[in-house]
């Protein structure tokens, strides 16, 4: 660039070219040679240089750069000037796009200068600027009208409406009845026990046992059990096509009383003729003995039957393969029965007997009897439709809301947090089997709830309606209306002078649910024509068509009857789906209502704000349109439309100048001047001077000016931060955190969903599930154990009394001898009984504690006696004569002689030799007897026949041997002599 001066003869047009080519037509100020006038551009630049010297550079540049800046300014002021003539005709400008032109009408701005290379002062000014470190900057060309927009007119806002028809009422919910039909039944049978016992020499064992149950005949039930409270001891039963007979205790048939059983379960009663069974054992060993026990048993038990009621089970474990509703009446004959007709019997007007009180029933009943191969069962017959029902009441709902939505009914029950869905058509109770109880129970429950809660506030608006909900729940619903609403309906009728049915008016859905369809016309409705002479052909055709229609209808009806089957309603075991449906409907209703209201409010707010936008666009169209389009645009109002152009993002650097003062000392920029480059890595020749706009928008012109004011303070957004100017001079950067924020947003306050707890509900309780089967196995087990304890205790069965058997045998023996033998037998048995009683008394005494002490004393006494006996035996062995005949001793003889007056010296001459010989013979005989007894004992121990024979022979020899001694005299000679 030359250092000469160019005279300012006027303003010229041109383009300033940088390295990037043609950029934009803009104004360039030329330097002047003379001293700057007031407000001239050079004066402005000098003022900027002074401010630059007075204010420390924010980037911390060294002092050498400041000195260079001063030198450069002096050269500009005092350098030589070269004056050139400036052509009066401006040079033609470089062509630019129409949309980028400054003025759309094509006029030239006289303040713009031709393109030239920047002088050092301009470079210094740019270098002293503040670089934007972050943030996005945009440059917006002025709109020319090639693109125009308009504001949308107001919209029609939607109105909140659920679109449902709500009806309140009372309901009763029914479920499938899985519980069996229960009734009382009597079981009659005779328990036969045949025992076979082996009798050995010293033991008895049970070798076989036969047990069987045989039914009691119906005649015996009539004649003995229910008439006298007794039962026969005889049993007749058929086994293997052979009629067998059994008698209790193998005796003749007798009538035994039925006594209550001591063992009975809470749900059953029993009576029997005996509590024990005995076994007969004869007196002869090495034989088998057979005995029979017959026990007549009557049990009152619980019977159960489940759908389709073709059999029932007893708590004894027996199953009867016949329906409990089978009978001889017309309606009962179609029920199931697997037994022959002769095994079944039905008695009208029967009065059973209570075996405890021995009283007959006052009211007669219809009694059924079935004889099976093992038992006879009786029960009171009842009608099936009266007692059996396939549905049972589950819940009584005192507050239910029904709404119609998308062709279905939704029954909402807040008390159990459940929603049931059904069709809009009513359910016919006739299509399900055994549902006669539903209508009765539903009516009673609904009437009871109405009288307690709603009689004074509501009125019924229809009859009871039945709907089959999903999951197998039958809902009996009766709609209601409040008294106020019903009064409004009545007033409407009076006002309009109408005579409609009040029920149809209060419940408009009733007509839709009656399932009434228009009857289709057919040939059946046309009477059969009678032939006439005028229209014979036509009447013949009608006759044939009528006949075909009758045949087709008959065939269709018969097929429908055979194909029509009643379907049993199956109910799910859980209502979790209904609870989830209730939760979903509750959330859906709340959310939909909330969103609908938000949409309505939003639309209303937008319509109101549209008026504000329409007025604000006249003040600042660029800001309004940019906020509306959510995009940076430049806008200008063209009448009733708005012209817009899109802004381009600046990719290069943006420098902010320190001073906002212009060349005129009285005029300043209202927004900071900047220098920027369009592209990255552009040199100084590609820089453009502009002005900082709002929200980081860069103007390519510096038109925003104002009169300079004192104490001026401004904050401008530059990038992501703010810059602070005071007296039109840059002071510092201000972070956004130091500036307090004022929010212009309106908070949206929404109501949250209310909390709702799900209650655990059981459709079937545990007791109901346990009670669903035919057999109660716990009851069966208890009954079988108690039955075994009652009748089959092995301790009472094998209880053989040998004494009683012997006594019975002796009595039978004497009884066979006639009356004399029977009398003798009575005497003998009485004595034997006394002996047995004595022995039993002794045995009981020994079992007593005092008896043990007595036994101890007896043992001690026996030991003492044994000691004295042992001493006596030893004395006999040592001196048998002295021990056996102590009178033969010498002392006794001397004493006798002394008493008769004799001397001791005469002993030898006067001793009686005959008596001595007799004594010797007696001792010898006693020795032989002792030896004979020993021999006999040895023979008995050895059980040898030879020894026994020898012993008997010895006894005979001793008996036949004559005595060796003479009879003693009655009077002693010595006594006679003494007396003389």
UniProtKB/Swiss-Prot annotation:
Pfam families: Glycoprot_B_PH1 (PF17416), Glycoprot_B_PH2 (PF17417), Glycoprotein_B (PF00606). One of its GO terms (cellular component) is viral envelope. It comes from the Viruses. Its main location: virion. Keywords: Disulfide bond, Glycoprotein, Host cell membrane, Host endosome, Host Golgi apparatus, Host membrane, Host-virus interaction, Membrane, Signal, Transmembrane, Transmembrane helix, Viral attachment to host cell, Viral envelope protein, Virion, Virus entry into host cell. Residues 1-86 form the signal peptide. Residues 88-118, 505-535 are annotated as: Disordered. Gene3D superfamilies: 1.20.5.1890, 2.30.29.100, 2.30.30.1230, 6.10.250.3280. Residues 794-847, 823-843 are annotated as: Hydrophobic membrane proximal region. Homotrimer; disulfide-linked. Binds to heparan sulfate proteoglycans. Interacts with gH/gL heterodimer. This is Envelope glycoprotein B. It comes from Equine herpesvirus 1 (strain V592) (EHV-1).
């Amino acid at each position: 660039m030359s250092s000469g001066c160019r005279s300012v003869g006027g303003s010229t047009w041109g383009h300033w070219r940088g390295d990037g080519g043609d950029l934009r037509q803009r104004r360039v100020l030329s330097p002047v040679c003379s001293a700057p006038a007031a407000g001239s551009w050079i004066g402005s630049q000098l003022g900027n240089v002074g401010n630059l010297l007075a204010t420390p550079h924010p980037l911390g540049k060294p002092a050498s750069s400041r000195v260079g800046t001063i030198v450069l300014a002096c050269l500009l002021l005092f350098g030589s000037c070269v004056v050139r003539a400036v052509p009066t005709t401006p040079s033609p400008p470089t062509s630019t796009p129409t949309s980028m032109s400054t003025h759309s009408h094509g006029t030239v701005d006289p303040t713009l200068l031709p393109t030239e290379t920047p002088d050092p002062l301009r470079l210094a000014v740019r270098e002293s600027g503040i670089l934007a470190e972050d943030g996005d900057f945009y440059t917006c060309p002025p709109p020319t009208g090639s693109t125009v927009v308009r504001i949308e007119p107001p919209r029609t806002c939607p109105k909140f409406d659920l679109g449902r028809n709500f009806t309140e009422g009372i309901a009763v919910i029914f479920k499938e009845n899985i519980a069996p039909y229960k009734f009382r039944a009597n079981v009659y049978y005779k328990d036969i026990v045949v025992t076979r016992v082996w009798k050995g020499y010293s033991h008895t064992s049970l070798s076989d046992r036969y047990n069987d149950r045989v039914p009691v005949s119906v005649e015996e039930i009539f004649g003995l059990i229910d008439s006298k409270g007794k039962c026969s001891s005889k049993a007749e039963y058929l086994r293997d096509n052979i009629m067998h007979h059994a008698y209790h205790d193998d005796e003749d048939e007798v009538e035994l009383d039925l006594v209550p059983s001591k063992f009975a379960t809470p749900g059953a009663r029993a009576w029997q003729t005996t509590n024990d069974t005995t076994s007969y054992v004869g007196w002869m060993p090495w034989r088998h003995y057979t005995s029979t026990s017959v026990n007549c048993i009557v049990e009152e038990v619980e019977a159960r039957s489940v759908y389709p009621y073709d059999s029932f089970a007893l708590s004894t474990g027996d199953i009867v393969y016949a329906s409990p509703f089978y009978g001889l009446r017309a309606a009962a004959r179609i029920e199931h029965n697997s037994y022959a007709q002769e095994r079944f019997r039905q008695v009208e007007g029967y009065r059973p007997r209570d075996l405890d009180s021995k009283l007959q029933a006052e009211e007669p009943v219809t009694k059924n009897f079935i004889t099976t191969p093992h038992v006879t069962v009786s029960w009171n017959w009842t009608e099936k439709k009266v007692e059996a029902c396939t549905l049972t009441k589950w819940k009584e709902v005192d507050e239910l809301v029904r709404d119609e939505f998308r062709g279905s009914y939704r029954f909402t029950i807040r008390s159990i947090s459940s929603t049931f869905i059904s069709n809009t058509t009513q359910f016919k109770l006739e299509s399900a089997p055994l549902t006669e109880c539903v209508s009765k129970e539903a009516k009673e429950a609904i009437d009871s709830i109405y009288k307690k809660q709603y009689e004074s506030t509501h009125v019924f608006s229809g009859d009871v309606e039945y709907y089959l909900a999903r999951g197998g729940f039958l809902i009996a619903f009766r709609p209601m209306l409040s008294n106020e609403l019903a009064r409004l309906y009545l007033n409407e009728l009076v006002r309009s002078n109408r005579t409609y049915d009040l029920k149809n008016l209060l419940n408009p859905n009733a007509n839709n649910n009656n399932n009434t369809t228009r009857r289709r016309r057919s040939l059946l409705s046309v009477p059969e024509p009678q032939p006439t002479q005028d229209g014979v052909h036509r009447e013949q055709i009608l006759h044939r068509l009528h006949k075909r229609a009758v045949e087709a209808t008959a065939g269709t009806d018969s097929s429908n009857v055979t194909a029509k089957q009643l379907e049993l309603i199956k109910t799910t075991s859980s209502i979790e789906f209904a609870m989830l449906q209730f939760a979903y409907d509750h959330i859906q209703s709340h959310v939909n209502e909330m969103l609908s209201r938000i949409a309505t409010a939003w639309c209303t707010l937008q319509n109101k704000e549209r008026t504000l936008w329409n007025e604000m666009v006249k003040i600042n169209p660029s800001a309004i349109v940019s906020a509306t389009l959510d995009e940076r645009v430049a806008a200008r109002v063209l009448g009733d439309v708005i012209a817009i152009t899109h802004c381009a993002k600046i990719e290069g650097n943006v420098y902010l100048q320190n001073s906002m003062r212009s060349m005129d000392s009285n005029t300043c920029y209202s927004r900071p001047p900047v220098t920027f480059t369009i592209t990255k890595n552009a040199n100084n020749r590609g820089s453009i001077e502009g002005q900082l706009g709002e929200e980081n928008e860069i103007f390519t012109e510096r038109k925003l000016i104002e009169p300079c004011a004192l104490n001026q303070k401004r904050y401008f957004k530059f990038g992501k931060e703010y810059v602070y100017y005071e007296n039109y001079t840059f002071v510092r950067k201000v972070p956004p955190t130091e500036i307090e924020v004022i929010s212009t947003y309106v908070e949206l306050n929404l109501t949250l969903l209310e909390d709702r707890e799900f209650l655990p509900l059981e459709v079937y309780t545990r007791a109901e599930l346990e009670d669903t089967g035919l057999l109660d196995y716990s009851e069966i087990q208890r009954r079988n154990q108690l039955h075994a304890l009652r009748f089959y205790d092995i301790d009472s069965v094998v209880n053989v009394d040998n004494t009683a058997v012997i006594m019975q045998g002796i009595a039978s023996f004497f009884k066979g001898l006639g009356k004399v033998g029977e009398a003798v037998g009575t005497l003998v048995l009485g004595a034997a009984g006394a002996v047995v009683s004595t022995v039993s008394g002794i045995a009981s005494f020994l079992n007593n504690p005092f008896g043990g002490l007595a036994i101890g004393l007896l043992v001690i006494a026996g030991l003492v006696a044994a000691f004295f006996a042992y001493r006596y035996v030893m004395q006999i062995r040592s001196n048998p004569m002295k021990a056996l005949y102590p009178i033969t001793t010498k002392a006794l003889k001397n004493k006798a002689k002394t008493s008769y007056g004799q001397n001791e010296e005469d002993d030898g001459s006067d001793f009686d030799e005959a008596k001595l010989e007799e004594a010797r013979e007696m001792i010898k005989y006693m020795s032989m007897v002792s030896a004979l007894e020993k021999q006999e004992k040895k023979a008995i121990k050895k059980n040898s026949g030879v020894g026994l024979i020898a012993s008997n022979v010895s006894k005979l020899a001793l008996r036949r041997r004559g005595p060796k001694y003479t009879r003693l005299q009655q009077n002693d000679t010595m006594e006679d002599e003494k007396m003389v």
